[in-house]
């Protein structure tokens, strides 16, 4: 999943 929140990038 691609999620951008609070300036943190999480590519899962």
Curated annotation (Swiss-Prot):
Top-level taxon: Eukaryota
Major localization class: secreted
Name used for this protein in its record: Unknown protein 8
Cellular compartment(s): Secreted, Cell wall
One GO term describing the cellular component: extracellular region
Keyword annotations of the record: Cell wall, Secreted
Keyword flag Secreted: yes
């Amino acid at each position: 999943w691609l999620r951008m929140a609070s300036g943190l990038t999480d590519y899962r």
